[in-house]
Curated annotation (Swiss-Prot):
Tissues/organs with expression: Expressed in numerous tissues; not found in breast, heart, small intestine and liver. Isoform 1: Predominantly expressed in the testis. Isoform 3: Predominantly expressed in the testis, at lower level in the placenta, during malignant progression of melanocytic tumors and in several tumors of varying origins. Isoform 4: Predominantly expressed in the testis, at lower level in the placenta, during malignant progression of melanocytic tumors and in several tumors of varying origins. Isoform 5: Predominantly expressed in the testis. Isoform 6: Predominantly expressed in the testis.
Record-given protein name: Down syndrome critical region protein 8
Gene that encodes it: DSCR8
Organism the protein comes from: Homo sapiens
Extra remark beyond the main annotation: Potential cancer-testis antigen, with expression restricted to the testis and certain malignant cells.
Length: 97
């Protein structure tokens, strides 16, 4: 007598679990990571997956607005990246030169 194979519900649940785990790991990979030293300091560096692209080209070529007015005094450059059009707000990211 032939062994019955896995039923459709079991296979479907397993596939759903695999998809959810894959999406979770993908989101964790793409999410920004905040790296700090062990002590409490006033400086942390934000590492984004697209940081190499942003730093390799001038912001004007990428369509980003820069605020260079206070760069000499603060030693930082601010980039304003538009969020999706649904929110219509701006997100500020600072890079140390």
């Amino acid at each position: 007598m032939k062994e019955p194979g896995p039923n459709f519900v079991t296979v479907r649940k397993g596939l759903h679990s695999f998809k959810m785990a894959f999406v979770k790991h993908l989101l964790l990979f793409l999410s920004p990571r905040l790296e700090c030293s062990g002590s409490i300091t006033d400086h942390c560096s934000l590492h984004l997956p697209v940081q190499e692209i942003l730093m390799s080209q001038p912001p004007e070529q990428l369509g980003l607005q820069t605020n260079l007015g206070n760069q000499e005094s603060s030693g930082m450059m601010k980039l304003f990246m538009p969020r999706p059009k649904v929110l219509a707000q701006y997100e500020s990211i600072q890079f140390m030169p």
